[in-house]
Structures are given as structure tokens and as C-alpha cells.
Amino acid sequence: YMMDMGKLIKDAEAMKRFGATMVMWDLKAMKPTQAFSVPGSPLEIRWSLREGDNWAITATALTSKLWLVKQDAKGEWQAKDVGTIGDPAKIPLPVDISIAPDDSKIYVNSYGDGTLRVYDVTNPFEGKLIHQVKLGEQANMVSTSWDGQRVYATSSLLSRWDKPGDQWLKA
């Protein structure tokens, strides 16, 4: 994976080496219940914690998409593309997401362009970009405070990719 990302994303054989599967688990029974496809290397998944909700959002690093993960009418888990993260041709490389405490927003940090994006997911079937800000090179982790008043972001992903002298924590 230590090759130019632009070349990697265009290389069908290289893309096959990255994960495109999500597995749902029954944590009480400690066993998987279903595996399904989410193209583009899904990384983090964030669940709505609102009472009665049964959905999550994931971001795919290599295709720069937001995906809604939800059961269909038959009880099967599905992933639906609900948003694009930046310009996929410029390889934003989303690496972390955080959901607001009220489940209304998803915060997405992208390593490739150093940008934090905020999506309104009050209707999770239609994620809408509502804000973005360039944080600096190598944006990595993002987290919201429990009261929803602050967002924290850090830099640094992998030491082999990191650029010297640009590690930070911003709030």
C-alpha cells in the first residue's frame, strides 16, 4: 500500500487487495450474522444512538464515499451510497469519522487534502455537506465532545507517510 494513491486507485488488481466487506455481528451470541459488500475500503463505522434508530454511517477511504448501513424490509443489512467526500479524483483519503452526540452530523477528516468536512445526516439517506475547513497537512483523527460543543482533530497517520514537522491537535 505504499504506492502513489492515484495509481493505486486506478489499478484494479491493487484495489482487490483492500477490503470491501462489512460483517455484522450478534455480540450476545458472539457470531457473525451477515457479510455484505461496501466498495472502497470502509474504515470506521458510527452508529446512531438515538432511541429507535438502527442505522450507521461508514466512509470508504479509497472511493471517498459516505455509506448508510441499514437493514432493509427483509431484515438484510445493506449499504447505500449517500454522499461523496471532496473530489475523489484528488484522492481526499477519508481516514476518520465522528458522529455528533445528537446524531445530526457526521464529521469526516481526510488525510489526502487535510480537510475536515461536516455532513448533515438528519435524513441519513441524503447526507449533505454543510461545512468544510482546511485543517492542515495530514488530518487524521476526529472526535466530538459529549456535549456537541467542540470538535477535536489531530494529524499523523502512518510514520512512513507523515511529513516532518506537521503534527498537531486542533480544537
Indicate residue ranges for each PLM-predicted region.
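Predominantly soluble domains enriched in secretory-pathway, periplasmic, or organellar proteins
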Residues: 1-171
